[in-house]
């Protein structure tokens, strides 16, 4: 298996929970609430954003660019994690929207670093687009079922 195929498999495998959780939540809200699927979605999204910040860090170093974008993402994800953990109120829609903005920032930061890799740029576009839709679906689900 060539490197491009391995990267595609890993990239799209990471997308599976982003897709399945909103689908299950919309089909059966009871399952979503009984099995804490909203929290699972948050957790998965935060883990993936952290992972993407790490890959952005590596790409920045390899390209001899500033690691400021990665640092901003790590800080944002960390602060959002603390906010989710310690907030007494239900700010899930706000937190999902912030995560959506973090993924946008990751995409635009990474896009500059992968200019010469067209096949990977295409994958990142499809993944980020899908992640946007999934976050919007979860925001809609939470808004509808409050």
Task: Indicate residue ranges for each PLM-predicted region.
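N-terminal membrane topogenic signal
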Residues: 1-14
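Alpha-helical transmembrane segments of multi-pass membrane proteins
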Residues: 18-28, 109
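Hydrophobic core segments of alpha-helical transmembrane domains in multi-pass membrane proteins
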Residues: 44, 94-105
């Amino acid at each position: 298996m060539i490197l491009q195929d391995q990267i595609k498999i890993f990239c799209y495998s990471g997308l599976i929970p982003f897709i399945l959780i909103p689908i299950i939540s919309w089909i059966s809200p009871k399952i979503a609430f009984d099995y804490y699927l909203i929290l699972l979605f948050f957790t998965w999204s935060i883990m993936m954003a952290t992972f993407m910040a790490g890959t952005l860090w590596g790409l920045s170093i390899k390209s001899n660019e500033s690691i400021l974008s990665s640092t901003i993402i790590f800080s944002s994800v960390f602060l959002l994690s603390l906010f989710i953990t310690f907030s007494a109120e239900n700010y899930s829609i706000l937190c999902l929207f912030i995560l959506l903005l973090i993924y946008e920032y990751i995409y635009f930061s990474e896009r500059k670093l992968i200019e010469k890799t067209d096949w990977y740029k295409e994958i990142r576009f499809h993944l980020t687009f899908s992640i946007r839709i999934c976050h919007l679906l979860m925001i809609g689900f939470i808004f509808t079922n409050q």
